[in-house]
Design a protein with these regions (language model features):
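A domain-level signal for the structural core that forms small-molecule/cofactor-binding pockets
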Residues: 2-75
Length: 75
């Protein structure tokens, strides 16, 4: 606890994904005062043509009350 899930389009390198996960974990431990052993980060790649159905509608539109950072695009 906590577990962070990042959803993004495919195409980022393994090195970029590892670095992103490391930086997210560092910020979570620093801001929320958890030990690094408590933090997990998953990266889920979603194809651009599936984004509206698999991410935008269920995670952004249908759960807007849980968003702390909203995107500046609409679909």
């Amino acid at each position: 606890m906590p577990h962070v899930i990042v959803k993004l389009w495919p195409g980022k390198s393994e090195q970029q994904k590892v670095r992103l996960a490391e930086e997210i974990a560092k910020d979570v431990t620093k801001i929320l005062n958890y030990g690094e052993e408590s933090v997990s980060v998953a990266i889920e790649e979603v194809e651009p043509q599936d984004w509206a159905e698999k991410v935008y509608q269920p995670d952004i539109v249908n759960n807007s009350e849980r968003l702390y950072k909203r995107p500046e695009y609409a679909m």
